[in-house]
């Protein structure tokens, strides 16, 4: 659950008040998260985060670069930027440095092989960010864009900026500029007032866009939010049925898209080894850390000696709706 993961990662002491050298790396030794901001200025009517975490605040640019250098010195090869709204980074500072500058600077740190950014708010994704992701070989061609819904009525009720039409155009623009891009989203079904027509619009949208990755959750009331007071509520039974419909559609889409990887080769990082299956669990740039996007299971009959954290070449040999299967090959 990517949202639960973010809340876990974002729920600790403000890192810009910490000495980064006191930090403990609790993830895999070769992969780490870097929180670039605190709080949120978006007032989505289902979310209590702005009430809990306060207004959006970017961490100073040089503080982030220093911490990223420290992580690289500790052996971290992949750095994933996180925040409640990463696209807003730097807009509250007077440094003239924004998300694209942060991606660029971190990617140039010796030892860093890949930089990834999560949680991009749709209407704040600038051409500069798209171009940096497109043109920088050390930035993952991966857009995590939580859109939440596709009915304009529900988007308005959620207090989400932008419309379904805007989102369709944005995704088309990204895919035109970066043909091999991976686009992930999250959706909420059962938001108060969601009716059959609203849900049909969401279904049609999912079938049209064909996201590479999609997570869907049922709405849950949060006290002190506008959504908490909205009526009529959608029943738990209806919400679960709608969730299952979306997931069934996405499973078919994912199965088809995953099979298109077969026969292709990629660079991938080794996360772990499954001794029972005699396979390595690896990720290429299309797979975020912490099992968010499923797995790539790779055999090693190449004769190469490999270790956890190594970057290897793989060839995809098979696929299903959730996972890919590969073999490690020589360059």
Q: Could you describe each region identified by the protein language model?
A:
Residues 90-107, 111, 157-158, 221-252:
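Radical SAM enzyme [4Fe-4S]-AdoMet core and its adjacent flexible, acidic
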